[in-house]
Amino acid sequence: MVNIRPEEISSVIFRQIEQYNQEVRVFNIGTVLQVGDGIARIYGLNEVMAGELVEFEDGTVGIALNLESNNVGAVLMGDGLTIQEGSSVKATGKIAQIPVSDAYLGRVVNALAQPIDGKGQIPASESRLIESPAPGIISRRSAYEPMQTGLIAIDSMIPIGRGQRELIIGDRQTGKTAVATDTILNQKGQNVICVYVAIGQKASSVAQVVNTFEEQGAMEYTIVVAETANSPATLQYLAPYTGAALAEYFMYRQQHTLIIYDDLSKQAQAYRQMSLLLRRPPGREAYPGDVFYLHSRLLERAAKLSSQLGEGSMTALPVVETQAGDVSAYIPTNVISITDGQTFLSADSSNAGIRPAINVGISVSRVGSAAQIKAMKQVAGKLKLELAQFAELEAFAQFASDLDKATQNQLARGQRLRELLKQSQSAPLTVEEQVATIYTGVNGYSDILEIGQVKKFLVQFREYLITNKPKFAEIICSTKVFTEQAEIILKEAIEEHTELFLLQEQK
């Protein structure tokens, strides 16, 4: 029989006592009263905070939005089909946050920043709150650098600056997404990080956009956040905030970012669905009372940071869909009042074959020429005035039978200027190409051409200019000014190419 020494026993007991941990873990637990339509009513959870994440037994996560006297209303970030009445719910003590890192570039993620492109996990060491406060007044400065879209109509007449919020608004099928995606394609080589947020769109449309980005090499500097039409309303509501958090990560690291919300009408509809199911009182068009705050707290996160914070920027291009051109509906007026200008796309222009279908008359940028290089200011000043006069004359000319020569000339010039603004999709132009194109139009060099020839002439002319007169692009790029030397080179190129073009057309 083994001798047991009492000292050994006592030392083992002492060791066990030392290792004993008296930690008490307290959980805030509740019980599901009712679940359905993406909403759960929970009894208990007495100390839960508004916006806190709650975890259900099956692993589904929800957000506590309604804190009522006898229950908590939570929205689910999933279908919630396996949650049962009477099951327990745990408060996590956290609010929604996402991992962030440079590795997100080139990836497609959902509203919880989880990859959905089948390319594996995304490494990330930092995280950011989905709902971060916007920069304050002292943290900002006014926008002064141009954010080129590559579209002549916008860059010349409705210029966008880095840190600006410019609304893209129009009916369905007027080319809103095309304007937004072309802007992303034009950021190639500009050192701008782009975030494209697709909210409630068809999965096929999102796939098409991602395909375009991949073909044109734009995915290298772009993150796509997608919640398609079959996603729960909660995730469609969160997607824009996730996109903003990813863009902010780069903005606070002294980089320039561009974020596109496509589109905020669908986010508002998802939020309306959640609010009505939570039994919040409906307001105008059945939207809840805080739908303005929904968009204002999102769009206020776009900013041009002060020099103390590194001068990073976040430019936001929110998209809003109108019904039959009604800009005075609830969501359009809300977003117009929050943003620094709007680019209005009209169905009439689109149907008339003017693409991009931008209605220059009612589109505006509140940053204005501060967001243009000097060369663009020099040539584009005349363009908006001439187009406005043309629109007025055109309306008048429909009723007048005999017009004097000056009026006929002005109408002819206006029609050619309108042709000059037409562009193919996914073919953004550099600023020097735009300057050359506008100069050709406003100085009457295209007046000798037939209207049908103008677009072809300009496409060939831009190629001719790049190939034969590289000095012109050098001057504009280096000095940002349309100098006398640049004008001489451009005039030469126009005359040479016009001669060639007319000879070709005669054959």
Swiss-Prot record:
Primary residence: plastid
Membrane topology: Peripheral membrane protein
Annotated positions for site Required for activity: 363
Residues annotated to bind ATP: 170-177
GO cellular component: chloroplast thylakoid membrane; proton-transporting ATP synthase complex
InterPro entries named among the record's database cross-references: ATP_synth_asu-like_sf, ATP_synth_asu_C, ATP_synth_asu_C_sf, ATP_synth_F1_a_nt-bd_dom, ATP_synth_F1_asu, ATPase_a/bsu_AS, ATPase_F1/V1/A1_a/bsu_N, ATPase_F1/V1/A1_a/bsu_N_sf
Keywords (A to Z) from UniProt: ATP synthesis, ATP-binding, CF(1), Chloroplast, Hydrogen ion transport, Ion transport, Membrane, Nucleotide-binding, Plastid, Thylakoid, Translocase, Transport
Pfam family name, one: ATP-synt_ab_C
Catalytic activity: ATP + H2O + 4 H(+)(in) = ADP + phosphate + 5 H(+)(out)
GO molecular function: ADP binding; ATP binding; proton-transporting ATP synthase activity, rotational mechanism
EC numbers for this chain: 7.1.2.2
Family per similarity comment: Belongs to the ATPase alpha/beta chains family.
Quaternary assembly: F-type ATPases have 2 components, CF(1) - the catalytic core - and CF(0) - the membrane proton channel. CF(1) has five subunits: alpha(3), beta(3), gamma(1), delta(1), epsilon(1). CF(0) has four main subunits: a, b, b' and c.
Protein name in the entry: ATP synthase subunit alpha, chloroplastic
Species this protein is from: Huperzia lucidula (Shining clubmoss)
